[in-house]
Amino acid sequence: MIRTVIFDIGMVLVYFRWRELYAQLGFEGEKFERIAKATVQNPWWNEFDKGLMTTEEVIERFAESAPEYKKEIVEIYNHMDEIVTLYDYAGPWSRELKEKGYRIYILSNWSKPAYEANLETNLCFLKEVYGEVMSFM
């Protein structure tokens, strides 16, 4: 009988809303595309999630890809608390599974700044889990 459930976070328990955040910050058209390619679509994004780079280091790497948008790239990091949105079902579902006796674990790729910015809000379901392993840990 299955008694343990292991969840990823992104696009399972939270919506990774980088497109909406970028639009909210006023990035449109070519600017949107250049900033996206310099950040979330850049291989350095995964290295940052792994915890191998500081925020300052990754911003510098991203800015190398789009130096004219360094200010905007910095602005993204001032809005890390808005880059994901908790799915409505995430909290109730994790509580229900826990009440039914399932042991819930999290295994996910997350950067430390995004984790810390969302811990009390969009990652509130973590209170229901038995353990977690994030890529930055």
Task: Describe the residue ranges of each PLM region.
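Short beta-strand/turn micro-motifs composed of small residues
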Residues: 108
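N-terminal helical cap/lid subdomain that shapes the substrate entry/recognition surface
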Residues: 2-92, 99-100, 111-115
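Substrate-recognition "cap/lid" segment bordering the active-site pocket of phosphatases
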Residues: 112-137
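Residues at the starts of beta-strands that form the adenosine-phosphate
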Residues: 103
